Every structure is written in C-alpha cells, then in structure tokens.
Amino acid sequence: MKPLSSPLQQYWQTIVERLPEPLAEESLSAQAKSVLTFSDFVQDSISAHPEWLTELESQPPQADEWQHYVAWLQEALINVSDEAGLMRELRLFRRRIMVRIAWAQTLALVTEESILQQLSYLAETLIVAARDWLYDACCREWGTPCNAQGEAQPLLILGMGKLGGGELNFSSDIDLIFAWPEHGCTQGGRWELDNAQFFTRMGQRLIKVLDQPTQDGFVYRVDMRLRPFGESGPLVLSFAALEDYYQEQGRDWERYAMVKARIMGDSEGVYANELRAMLRPFVFRRYIDFSVIQSLRNMKGMIAREVRRRGLTDNIKLGAGGIREIEFIVQVFQLIRGGREPSLQSRSLLPTLSVIAALHLLSENDAEQLRVAYLFLRRLENLLQSINDEQTQTLPSDELNRARLAWAMDFADWPQLTGALTAHMTNVRRVFNELIGDDESETQEESLSEQWRELWQDALQEDDTTPVLAHLSEDDRKQVLTLIADFRKELDKRTIGPRGRQVLDHLMPHLLSDVCAREDAAVTLLRITALLAGIVTRTTYLELLSEFPAALKHLISLCAASPMIASQLARYPLLLDELLDPNTLYQPTATDAYRDELRQYLLRVPEDDEEQQLEALRQFKQAQLLRIAAADIAGTLPVMKVSDHLTWLAEAMIDAVVQQAWVQMVARYGKPNHLNEREGRGFAVVGYGKLGGWELGYSSDLDLIFLHDCPMDAMTDGEREIDGRQFYLRLAQRIMHLFSTRTSSGILYEVDARLRPSGAAGMLVTSTEAFADYQKNEAWTWEHQALVRARVVYGDPQLTAHFDAVRREIMTLPREGKTLQTEVREMREKMRAHLGNKHRDRFDIKADEGGITDIEFITQYLVLRYAHEKPKLTRWSDNVRILELLAQNDIMEEQEAMALTRAYTTLRDELHHLALQELPGHVPEDCFTAERELVRASWQKWLVEE
C-alpha cells in the first residue's frame, strides 16, 4: 500500500485529535489510517459505529461480496414491524455497505468494474427489499391487486441510467420508472381499490421510504421524471399505457434513456419478460437506423450548451471528453445498429464497447483508449464523491482534496494527476468529434481580404477604407470607423486573456465583412458591438460565433432588424445558443407544446434546487421569446399568431410556477384536507386583460387573480398544520415571489394582482363564493368590463366551471342601456385624460382617441349591453372573436365588425413592431388616419348617440 503523502500525513494529525476513544491511534492499522484520512464520510461513519471498523479489519471487502447483500439485508430486516423501522434499517445498511465499498475503493482492493457492480447491486437490493416489504404491507392494508382472472399483479421497477447499466456512481440519484401489468382491482381487503390507485399509493410510499431524509440520512434521492409525461404524468403506468406512449409519443431522447433500462429484482419472471419484449422494438429498430444521427447531433449540441450554461470547465462528467461523451459514443452504435446486432443490446458500457471493437465499428486503438479513459474517469469520480458522500463531478479547488485524489489515484501530486486526466479526456473528445459530424461538411474558411483584417486591427487610414466601405455614405463610413475604434478602446479595459484575443481577432474580420455589406451598417454595428462588449470575457460565446458562421449571420440579421433582440442577447448571452439551429430559431414551438417543452427543459435542473429552477424558467422564456420575435421579423407569424404564442408561453410559465409553489408549500405544510377525497388542488389562476384576451405583447405584464374553494374549517395535513385558507394565501404569495424574484436572468413577468376584489386593499387570494358575491353586489361597471376579458389560465376543472358560470351570470345581467353607456364612456374619458398622449403631434396607438382601447371599450360595452338577450356573446374573451360574435348575433353589422377587426389587428401589429424596435407606442399624427376615423365613427355610434 502506498504511504500517505506529506500533506495527508499532516492532515492525519488533526484527525487523531477528533477520533472517539474506541479508535485510538495505536489500535489502527495503516490501512485504516489511510482510509480515514482520505474520506470524511468513512471517518464520520466509523466514529459513529466503531464496530464497523472491527468488521472491516477481520472481514476485508471482497470483489464478490455483492452476492451476499440480499441475505445480509434480509437478516437486518427480520424484526422490522413498521415503516419507520424499515426506513431506519435501510439507511443503516446502505451506510454500512457504502463504507465497505469506500474502503475497498480507496485501497484499490478490487477493480473499478467491481466497485461499479457493488454500488449498482447495493441500490437494487435496497430498492427491491423496500418494494417487497411495502407490497406485503399494502396488500394487508388494501387487499392484493389482481387482474380480471384474479392473478396477483406485481409492481415492476425499471432502473434507468447508470443504475440500469450496472454502473452507478458512489453518490448518485436513482432514476426509476414504475409499471404494473394489467388493470383490475384489489381482492381480500376491507374495501376495493383500482389497481392504479393501489400502485400509485404504494409508489408514493416507496419513494418516501427511499428518499425522505431522517436522522439516519436517506437511502437514495429518487428521480421519477423519466417516466412518460414526466412530472405531469401518472406515477405508475400499466403495461398497456406504457406501450401506447412509447409507440405514439416516445422521443429520441427517451430511446437514448431506455437503452440502459433494467428491471430491478426478478428480471426473468413472466411479467418481466413481457415488459422487456414490449420495450425492445422502441429502443432497437430492426433496420440500421441512420435517421437517429440528426437526433444525436442535437444531443451533442445540448451537451455543449449545458457545459456553457453551467460553466463546467472542471467537470469530469459533462465537460469536453468527459464520462457522458464516452457513454454517448457507445450508445450511438447501440441506437443505430442495435436492432440488427443483438450483441449491441447490452446495458453496460464496457461489454458493449468490446462488441463495438469486435464488429470493427471503432478501431481497436480507439476502443482501448475509451476503455482506459472510462475506468480512469469513473475511479476518479467515485473517489471524489466518496470523500464526503457528495454528488459532484467537479474537480476540487482546495489543496486537501486535491492531495487526497492525487494519492488515491496513485500520482505523486495534483499536476501529475491533471496531466493524465487531460490526456484521457483529449482522446475521448477526438473520438467524439470524429463520430458525430455536423449536418453539412464544413466549408473552407472564406478567404478574407487583408483589408478586413487591417480594418479590425485599426491599421487603415480613412482614405484606405474606400474599397471595403465604398457603398456607404461619408457619414456612415466615419461612424463605422468610430465604432470600431471605440470598441477596441473598450476591449483594452477588459481582462480578456490570450485565447479570447485570438478568437476575437478571428471573428471580427468575418463580422465586419458581413455587417459592412449592409446599407444599415452603422446602426447594426452599434448594436452588435454593444452586445460583444458584454461577452468578450466569456470566450465560449465568442467561439460559438467564430466557429458557426451561420449563427453569426443570424445574429447580424436579427440585431439589424430589432434593437430589442440585440438588447436581449446582450443582457442574456446564453440565448446565443439559439442561433445555432435555424430550424428552431425561426420556427416557434407549437402553441400547444409549450408546457411539454418547458417540462423537458426543466428535467435538466435538480428538482430541489430553487435557484436553478428559477433561472431555468427565465432562460426558457427568453429563448422562446427570441424564437417568436425572430419568426415575427421574418414575417412567418401574423400579429394574432404572435400574441397566441406569447399567451401560450405565459400559460406554460404560470403552470410551472404554480407547480413549483405547490410542491414547496405542500412540503412545508401538507395539503389542505378538503382535497383528500377529490382530485386537483382547489386552486385557480384567472388571467385578465391582455393575457385573458389572448393579446399579450413582448413586454406585457400579467394581470392575475387567484381563487380557491377551501372550506372555512379546512386544515393542512402536514407536520406544520395551518388553516387551509392561510395555505392558499401563502401559495399565492409564493407564486408572486417566484414570478418577481430577480435572478441573473431577470424576472419572469411583472404580475399585477390589483384586479382582484377590492383591488390592492383586498385579499391576495379569494374564495370562489366571495368572488361571486363581490361581482354580484359590490363590483363597479369597469370591473364587469374587465371580466369580459377574463378566463381561467390554470385551475381544476370544477373551479374553471364555477368561474365561467359566475362570469356568464354577471355578463348576462340585464342592464339599463343609457346608464351603462354613460358609465363606460365616462370611464374611458378618465383614462384618456390620465393616460393619453401628451405630444400633440403624435398619436398614441393604444390610449388616444381612435386607438386600441376605444375598440376594446366598444366590444366590452356591447357584450355587457346585449349578453342578457344573446348569452352566446359571453363565449370568448378576446376582441377579435367577440367582434365575430357581435356580427353573428346581429348586434353589429358584419361590415363594421370586419372593419374594426382590421383596424384592431393593424394597430396591434404596429405596436408589436414598435416593441421590436424598442420604440414607444406612438407614431406621427398623420399615421393610421383611416383606421382612427373608423373607430371614432363606431365609438360615436355606440357610446355617444342615443
């Protein structure tokens, strides 16, 4: 055994002073001293359980001892009689065995392959034991789940990722999917439960037993987000539901994940074989599947963006040449050829890599380099995590942990270790890059004239610029030269580093040649240099623009078209990744797919990391906003569709924010107990104004009110019990907080909740009964006008139906026409006096006479005036469809309705484009005169004349 290095010997002296009496220094072997010095986790564990050290010394860890885990655990559980006892014994067993594995790993008593096998089989043993104990307990409590033939139905558990592949790392989440074979009901219990209910409840208890922290720690962090439909899907699915999902909706990333899926426990039973046979055609296609190449390219891009997003420069898993790239290389061949080559259908990486070499899909040299690199990286990863039983793949920055790793990896010092690490990761990155090329072969770098380089290097006199800037006016030419000079002066103030300078010197001649070819070169260059000034110290973004000419061209065209987009990219350079793929850049997400896209995006972020969750929500919104704006600029989205996309995006955000707030509140207080006998959350979010009317703009805030149907006597069922209505108040406050918290990516949305009953003086969240009573007995006419543009944007079906009924009832109340006309007109006049344009030579598109607000007031007045006679007028909340309804119900002539619709969409379109130009919403007085006259005439007809 290698002696401890000098820094570790010094550290050992500090440990001796802390050791409990049973671990006196003179009684410890050299092996024990080495392991205790290396791992704080082992040190803490053995200090708490000195008998474990005796066991380690008398029965040292063996490579094949995983075969005894089941028997050892059964013995530990033999006297367990309740769930608390089960949780305690599982946690102690896991800790005891992990200490043995850490001991064997630190001292290199067994191979790294054996360590991975032991870690994986330990997890499987604990999962299966917990499942089987709980299954028996649940059957005693609720009866045995059976199919139509009366045959007992088991819970099958798919272990995904490294758990499925038998390659679990030392401190790891476990990704699981739960399934049961056939529908049916329980038999033999006090009451009958549907199988879905039985397995859902059992699954929830299983997750709690494994995942919930106690004074003994936890067993494993359980991640269920890889199941069909993710967080929004059922916790447990029948075989039939699984098959339907993967046949009809399974995506390439799910094929990628399913390659390693393994059934935990009895993997050779009838049901296990049935499940495996059902999934195989989805994962492994019968033909050689080169169609997967594009998906794999996309995944490669996702890896690169993840590395940039999180700054993972020292990450041995996700960084360039890291563990994930080796896994990716192997799975490329499995996904492409696995259907035709059964030998490639292994879940484990190293055996599959051997098959790949045997089939000559990789050279023997490349395969061997990958094998050696993989074992090196996995040992380094497991050692790193075993120091403190911590889930990390980032190399340490402190001297102690660096000394620990260098010693355990058998290197003299840290520089020697990092040198070997760099060599391995370089080999991996080379194979990775060779395997997955770009869509098109790289074109040769366009030869730039020496003058463009000299222009950037400030080596040209003004007279020398004529050839390259000949098409520009003299003023523009001078402005371009000034901008370049100012940008270079700005760079001199920054700490860029030699690599950044090199990339910038390569990028700028390309950029200048493209920008200066434009007639609007000066204004475009102004916007782009402002953007570049914000990212010059972040070389990865400069490299992105330098290495992907298409991304640079998109950047130039978008910045030229819209200062708003230029500002967004400057504030949030992470959005530059969106420029890589024009197929998504100019093609916004389908309106009904935002929720699913957001769910997939959030899968990358730890569920319990609120800061990263907030950041991810904002980054997703900004990326989607960029796509919508790009499509708007390109002319592929008309104004109505722009608002549709912005509205659907906002609704997806509301859905995710409510979900996060709900999970956080329930974790703290439990659920209100009136929900125990029903589905849903008893909560709704109502959108007013532009959100309610499907008319959001690029910078619109959200007008929201919150409703609940919680009885007065309801309480929460958690350890910290609170009043049910107090729970919903805190939920609404939490939602407001999640929307408004400012992170490095800004806020999510400005939220205005003042349209709630009694405005800012009222409760933030209102019961459905109180809302209905307020609308009937206290609300002003303007509040009923606002209700015309209101709809539920998140909520249980029963609350949605209740709100719709209240809205319909209020809007269909009989109203005296003259009184209503006066109240609506006077409210509009007050608004115009307060909000109207103060510049006599300008027209405020929204607030001035003949503008958008006049059209909105006309439609609201007519709905409130005539809905009593024509209830169908209450159906929609947006102005365009309300105008259609007014024509269809003979309130307004069709010609007038169509003319108002055209005026409305024309003015809205102009507002969108002004927003893209970061200009205020007013135009010269002589603009839109025809539309304004039309609106004035309609206003006069409906709201002035008797």
From Swiss-Prot:
GO terms for biological process: regulation of glutamine family amino acid metabolic process. Involved in the regulation of glutamine synthetase GlnA, a key enzyme in the process to assimilate ammonia. When cellular nitrogen levels are high, the C-terminal adenylyl transferase (AT) inactivates GlnA by covalent transfer of an adenylyl group from ATP to specific tyrosine residue of GlnA, thus reducing its activity. Conversely, when nitrogen levels are low, the N-terminal adenylyl removase (AR) activates GlnA by removing the adenylyl group by phosphorolysis, increasing its activity. Residues 449-946 are annotated as: Adenylyl transferase. It catalyses: [glutamine synthetase]-O(4)-(5'-adenylyl)-L-tyrosine + phosphate = [glutamine synthetase]-L-tyrosine + ADP; [glutamine synthetase]-L-tyrosine + ATP = [glutamine synthetase]-O(4)-(5'-adenylyl)-L-tyrosine + diphosphate. NCBIfam families: PRK11072.1. Keywords: ATP-binding, Magnesium, Multifunctional enzyme, Nucleotide-binding, Nucleotidyltransferase, Transferase. GO terms for molecular function: [glutamate-ammonia-ligase] adenylyltransferase activity; [glutamine synthetase]-adenylyl-L-tyrosine phosphorylase activity; ATP binding; magnesium ion binding. Its cofactor is Mg(2+). Residues 1-440 are annotated as: Adenylyl removase. InterPro entries: GlnE, GlnE_rpt_dom, NT_sf, PII_UdlTrfase/GS_AdlTrfase. PANTHER family: BIFUNCTIONAL GLUTAMINE SYNTHETASE ADENYLYLTRANSFERASE_ADENYLYL-REMOVING ENZYME (PTHR30621:SF0), GLUTAMINE SYNTHETASE ADENYLYLTRANSFERASE (PTHR30621). The keyword Repressor does not apply. It is an enzyme of class 2 (transferase). Pfam families: GlnD_UR_UTase, GlnE. Coiled coil: none annotated. It comes from Escherichia coli O157:H7. One of its GO terms (cellular component) is cytosol. Belongs to the GlnE family. This is Bifunctional glutamine synthetase adenylyltransferase/adenylyl-removing enzyme. Its EC number is 2.7.7.89, 2.7.7.42.
